[in-house]
Structures are given as C-alpha cells and as structure tokens.
Amino acid sequence: MSQNSLRLVEDNSVDKTKALDAALSQIERAFGKGSIMRLGQNDQVVEIETVSTGSLSLDIALGVGGLPKGRIVEIYGPESSGKTTLALHTIAEAQKKGGICAFVDAEHALDPVYARKLGVDLENLLISQPDTGEQALEITDTLVRSGAIDVLVVDSVAALTPRAEIEGEMGDSLPGLQARLMSQALRKLTGSISRSNCMVIFINQIRMKIGVMFGSPETTTGGNALKFYASVRLDIRRIGSIKERDEVVGNQTRVKVVKNKLAPPFKQVEFDIMYGAGVSKVGELVDLGVKAGVVEKSGAWFSYNSQRLGQGRENAKQYLKDNPEVAREIETTLRQNAGLIAEQFLDDGGPEEDAAGAAEM
C-alpha cells in the first residue's frame, strides 16, 4: 500500500514538472525570453544598484548604501526643509559615477548656481520646465523608456497641474483630477522604470487635512498612488538653525525613512545642511564617528587615532575639511561598519502613523 502511494507521489511530481516546463515554454513563446524566470537565476533582480544620497548617515539608514535604481522614490516635507537639496546631491553622486541625469522642474524654481555648488555638472544635466502636468509626465515617460537616464527628479508633484485646470477659470472645482493623473502615470511608468534601471525621485509637498480630530492632519499631494508605488519614502524636516555668532548659516535636518521595501524602515537620522554648500559631510563624520567609537570625544576635544581633531564640534569639522585624507579614512571605516551602526546607533522612529500617512505600504 505504501509503495503504491510512493509511486503516485513520484508520478505526480514528474507530471507537475512537465506541466510547469510546458507552461514556461508557452509563456516565453508568447511574450519573449525572460518574461518569466526563477528568481535566483536573475542576477539583476538579486543585486540592487544604488546611488548615494550625499549623506553618509542616510545611506547607512537606507540599509543598502543609498537610494535604489530601477525604483520610485518620494521625498516629502514642509517648505525649505531640504527636499530639492537632497535630490540635487543624489544627482551629483550619480554624475560622479558617469551617470546621465534629468530634472523635470515643474515648479520653475531650480537655482543653477546652488546646484553647481552642490557638485551638479550643469553642462550634462538635462532640464525640462513643462507647462502642464501631462506634459511633465509624458517627458518623464519618454526619458525613462530611452534607457539612457540613471536618475530623474520631478520637482514637484504639487506643481503637476492638470491641463484642464490650467485651461479652466480661477475657482473651478475639479476634484481628484491631479490624483487621477498621478495614478494613471505611475501605472504606466512603473514597468519602464524597472526595465530601464532608472531611479525616479518625486519631490512632494505637505498639505493639511481639514477636520482631523485624531492622528496627524498632514497629507501629501497627488493622492495615494505614489505612496503605494514608491519603494522608498523619506520625510525630511528642519529641526533647528545653525548659527555663527548671530548669523544663521544652516539648518539642522532630520530625515525619517518612513517606507523602505529593501531594508527595515523607520530609521531616523540627523545632519546639517549649510546654506550655499548643502549637506555637511564632515559634520556627519564627527557625529557618526563619536557614536560608533571611531572618533573619540573627551570633554570638548575630538580625536582620531590619538590625533587631536579640535576643541568643539565646529573646530573638529574644520580640521576634517582641511585634511580630506583623514576624513576619507573615517568615512571608509564607518561604511565598513554600516550594518552595526544602523542597528545600534541610528534612531528607530517606530511604525506609528507618521505625517502624511507615511506608514502606508
């Protein structure tokens, strides 16, 4: 009896294998080779290529060393919080690796002088300033489908005004028009983005929901589609000012990874954004170095390998600016221990309902 049962199982197994092979062959004949495969055989899927954000602590918090290519990323936050700065840093890092980047400036507010200061190569940056939301998303789709673009930034979702709204009159009520536009565009874009291995960064603004009694009243523009299609969502906030004597020279910034499909989410980091210079990389090296035990702090003095960097954080930052080889050495050590730093030293904001419905997956 047991032998008959065993033979039946073996026969079923052989039949299933034959049926599966026949089905796979039929799918490949109908839709082309590579339309279906075993996941482990596809090295492109297993190995995720990333681009640095320009912030060491944020790269570590993201868990994969930066923002992923072939995916949609959303950066949102209040006004003047550093959204465009972070996107421009990502473009600069991609260009350093020889990548081609594009910037769809729907807000018509890109400052080329500031972009150059952040390291962006303006001569090789493609820029478009579209008249309507449809035009912006059509340009985005065409560039992505070309397969030649590495990073494409859309600034911002809130400025993607539907054609019907532009051609209409002030005060016309057109509910849900922008949300439908974004939903349709993202359905069309997602497959092309994955195939072309192009990273598309959508910058978004925050709005207030009326009549919310409990929870955060904040939400992002453009409906819910972007929340679902984005592989990474970053909430960026200004939490303080940096002063030299009485003059404000920068912002203290907090970024929370509110959604991450590639690594554990909810990591939270803080760094400085200096006016006219962008993310303070040396400031991050000092702060992360102290947390990880790479840089020693004794009283007000900072030291590395028994070598004094300076008294006070600002003096230590200046020393690293003047001695880039020491800064590179500290950065290399920190990147080598990225997993440990992310696990032990970066704040975990927790999965509570964040601003703008951030925890939606």
Curated annotation (Swiss-Prot):
Domain of life: Bacteria
Phenotypic consequence of gene deletion: Greatly increased sensitivity to MMS, decreased bacterial load in BALB/c mice, but bacteria still persist 100 days after peritoneal injection. Increased sensitivity to UV light (but considerably less than expected compared to E.coli), hypersensitivity to MMS, slightly increased sensitivity to H(2)O(2). Loss of mitomycin C-induced expression from a recA promoter. 4-fold less survival in mouse macrophages, where the bacteria has to survive an extremely hostile environment.
GO molecular function per UniProt: ATP binding; ATP hydrolysis activity; ATP-dependent DNA damage sensor activity; damaged DNA binding; single-stranded DNA binding
Cross-referenced InterPro entries: AAA+_ATPase, DNA_recomb/repair_RecA, DNA_recomb/repair_RecA_CS, P-loop_NTPase, RecA-like_C, RecA-like_N, RecA_ATP-bd, RecA_C_sf
Function per UniProt: Can catalyze the hydrolysis of ATP in the presence of single-stranded DNA, the ATP-dependent uptake of single-stranded DNA by duplex DNA, and the ATP-dependent hybridization of homologous single-stranded DNAs. Interacts with LexA causing LexA activation and leading to its autocatalytic cleavage. High basal expression of RecA may be important in slowly-dividing Brucella for intracellular survival in its hostile host. Confers methyl methanesulfonate (MMS) resistance to an E.coli recA deletion mutant. This protein is constitutively activated; its expression in an E.coli recA deletion leads to constitutive expression from a recA reporter gene. Presumably it constitutively activates LexA autocleavage, but no data was published.
Classification via PANTHER family: MITOCHONDRIAL DNA REPAIR PROTEIN RECA HOMOLOG-RELATED (PTHR45900:SF1), RECA (PTHR45900)
Protein name per its UniProtKB record: Protein RecA
The species this protein was found in: Brucella abortus (strain 2308)
Name of the encoding gene: recA
